[in-house]
């Protein structure tokens, strides 16, 4: 399978040779560490999710040996499923932190409410694959950095600049795209016509590399960063003020004016919120107003976590 290279040119912006070489080097480093399974033909099984299978109609996609899948429990005897190529939607995630997980749940909830079958594809759960090993290594690094950032000096000199400027650069996306090529094999035996919604950029990038035909990249952050680019997919954003920043790739190549994202690659969709919360908005607001008028305490529903 010949993948289209997504690292040397990003939305028409040519990367310097040294950036491209660094990206290739990054991929080689991971191959050396975790192996290259691009020729592997992993079996794929579908089974009902034990936790949100009944409530949200979610099915897990297991890749490779089920025993090496984080979501598999041999004693659960979960109901087996099949791929619904007419009404199926894959929610691709990496189980990284609360924010991404919450958004994944919201996507599954909205899909079910609209009559679709949501499939849960956690790229960080396939123990025998290079994909999961690469994601695990990057998650560990991010987690370590996050914990170290409690130190004000580390936070000021390393963590904040990396989060605000490092992740913002197109050069970062070039390396990510090369690494994401190593994640593509998990999609090999997944029907290519089923739409994929990535709630993290890696499942979206990997899906595009693997030849999935309809890929949505649900961007969680409103601060425009090249980290969140997955060329070849439709990017969605949650608020108006980030639209132009992403569209013109603002500040992603230092002071240079970049070629923009094509208009059909970016869509303002509004907030990623579970159907169960949205459907009660009017009644809930009326109840809040009633409570206020009666002098009762105000109550808030807050989700605590990243995105």
Language model: regions and residue ranges:
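Conserved N-terminal ligand/cofactor-binding loop architecture of enzyme catalytic domains
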Residues: 4-69, 105-185
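A short, basic/flexible loop-to-alpha-helix module at the beginning of a structural domain
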Residues: 70-86, 185, 225
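A short, charged/proline- and glycine-enriched loop
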Residues: 79-89, 212, 293-300
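A short, glycine/small-residue-rich beta-strand->loop->alpha-helix junction that serves as a flexible
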Residues: 94-105
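Conserved nucleotide-sugar donor-interacting segment of glycosyltransferase catalytic cores
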Residues: 95, 127-134, 178-238, 242
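Short, surface-exposed amphipathic charged segments that create phosphate/polyanion-binding patches used
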Residues: 134-138, 231-235, 279-289
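Active-site-proximal region of nucleotide-activated glycan assembly enzymes
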Residues: 210-281
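Active-site donor-nucleotide binding/catalytic segment of nucleotide-sugar enzymes
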Residues: 269-271, 280-284, 288-307
